[in-house]
Amino acid sequence: MDSFDYTTPDYGHYDDKDTLDLNTPVDKTSNTLRVPDILALVIFAVVFLVGVLGNALVVWVTAFEAKRTINAIWFLNLAVADFLSCLALPILFTSIVQHHHWPFGGAACSILPSLILLNMYASILLLATISADRFLLVFKPIWCQNFRGAGLAWIACAVAWGLALLLTIPSFLYRVVREEYFPPKVLCGVDYSHDKRRERAVAIVRLVLGFLWPLLTLMICYTFILLRTWSRRATRSTKTLKVVVAVVASFFIFWLPYQVTGIMMSFLEPSSPTFRLLKKLDSLCVSFAYINCCINPIIYVVAGQGFQGRLQKSLPSLLRNVLTEESVVRESKSFARSTVDTMADKTQAV
């Protein structure tokens, strides 16, 4: 049984050749946690406190705005994905504290980590959807004014959640629990039954659809958007654009270690020194990725307005100011007028 997960929502392995410490008591595990695990626990605790409160506030604000603004629909779904991910943190926290022992049973082993993965991939795909929406606002403003509606936005969000569900299915199907006796513990993880090709195929598909493809989408969309908006004075009011770019940048900075170590572990042999090192850093990489779940509300508040204004306004007011559609609509209309005027000038010249 080569593939087995200790701590992460999906990546990780069990190695039958792990060295058994003969000095370890049979009736209990070591009382000492590794340094990476301790750092992961600290990060998990901070992310849980900030992420649950912050994303709950974003959900509360955008739930009212989503009835009339498309921008709020995007951020509502993104906040829901992050909020649910943060709610699952006590599960990972408990497992690490108990030296990766899984006390929740077999059914929970299949369901709970898979739900964490679902919310993670939903967050990724929603970010790509938001970037595509921003691209259309800048380059197809007239089309957006005619066809960009709340119904279409909700459909796009449903597609993102559906694709995230498909990416999560392997985790649900291949998760099992394994009982160990030296020291006694129950491990929850993914078991591909020595099928390395299947394991690598799943890892590659998730890397492409859950990371590289969204990354390419974001890079293309925002490169063209930045070039276009900064080439015209009339479209340089980009408050929402700055917020989304900050959210996207933070996402890939914090998720990159998880993705890199995950794909490396799927191709390495469990007995290799590199694999063993990555396995020790596993919890830390997951906790680093989880920072993204709590940093988005902070970005929204900081981007709201100047420091003095932040002191004078309440948090809900600041979030409402950032997450509403007004600045986006003004930018789109401004660019549309600029495009029409340019076409008129060319017609007169002919």
From Swiss-Prot:
PTM remark: Sulfation plays a critical role in the association of C5aR with C5a, but no significant role in the ability of the receptor to transduce a signal and mobilize calcium in response to a small peptide agonist. Sulfation at Tyr-14 is important for CHIPS binding.
Transmembrane segments: 38-64, 70-93, 111-132, 154-174, 201-226, 243-265, 283-303
Phosphoserine, modified sites: S314, S317, S327, S332, S334, S338
Membrane protein topology class: Multi-pass membrane protein
Main location: membrane
Annotated compartments: Cell membrane; Cytoplasmic vesicle
Sequence positions bearing Sulfotyrosine: Y11, Y14
Annotated S-S bridges: C109-C188
CDD domains: 7tmA_C5aR
Keywords: Cell membrane, Chemotaxis, Cytoplasmic vesicle, Disulfide bond, G-protein coupled receptor, Membrane, Phosphoprotein, Receptor, Sulfation, Transducer, Transmembrane, Transmembrane helix
Residue segments, region Required for CHIPS binding: 10-18
Region (Involved in C5a binding): 21-30
Domain of life: Eukaryota
GO biological process: chemotaxis; complement receptor mediated signaling pathway; inflammatory response; mRNA transcription by RNA polymerase II; phospholipase C-activating G protein-coupled receptor signaling pathway; positive regulation of cytosolic calcium ion concentration; positive regulation of epithelial cell proliferation; positive regulation of ERK1 and ERK2 cascade
Residue ranges that the UniProt entry lists as topological domain Extracellular: 1-37, 94-110, 175-200, 266-282
GO MF entry, a single one: complement component C5a receptor activity
Pfam families linked to this entry: 7tm_1
Family: Belongs to the G-protein coupled receptor 1 family.
Subunit structure: Homodimer. May also form higher-order oligomers. Interacts (when phosphorylated) with ARRB1 and ARRB2; the interaction is associated with internalization of C5aR. Interacts (via N-terminal domain) with S.aureus chemotaxis inhibitory protein (CHIPS); the interaction blocks the receptor and may thus inhibit the immune response.
Its job: Receptor for the chemotactic and inflammatory peptide anaphylatoxin C5a. The ligand interacts with at least two sites on the receptor: a high-affinity site on the extracellular N-terminus, and a second site in the transmembrane region which activates downstream signaling events. Receptor activation stimulates chemotaxis, granule enzyme release, intracellular calcium release and superoxide anion production.
Name this protein carries in UniProt: C5a anaphylatoxin chemotactic receptor 1
Species for this entry: Pan troglodytes
Lineage: Eukaryota, Metazoa, Chordata, Craniata, Vertebrata
